[in-house]
Amino acid sequence: MAERVAVFVDAGYLFAQGSAAISGSKKARVDISLNAQAVIDELKSTAQQCAAGLSLLRIYWYDGAIGGSRLTAEQALLAHLDDVKIRLGFVNSSGQQKGVDSLIVTDLIELARQKSICDAVLVSGDEDVRVGVQIAQNYGVRVHLVGITPSRGTQSLQLLQEADTTTEWKKE
């Protein structure tokens, strides 16, 4: 098994919970500005804390595409950063991100099955990714779940119970 860690980021969770942590309530995506490099640097730092000594395979950034596969300016910026791979679901007519959980599950399982990683850092709260966590663990991958304060109210209890470790990002 490769001595590498991969990071899996549900952008919908990151934006919703990040905006709530900073401003006290969830904000619409159009009202949020992301310092992409700072977030990627923090994700890399978190990966090193969770999986000390392992090299980073890459950061997988899962987000919804509006109107098909067009990248937003923010997504395009992220896609050009080193060590980042954008994976797109879609945004439905109600503005909800869809198809992202299945992409996370598929990538997590495939990287585990191929023995491409030994650790995974997951930034999500959705119970739908729990099956991917379970299967990756069956292949020997340790899964580190990262939440955004107050994560205990914003992450599935079953997902928290499945993770090997849990970490909470604070407001700062």
What are these regions (language model features)?
Residues R70-E172:
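Nuclease catalytic cores that cleave nucleic-acid phosphodiester bonds
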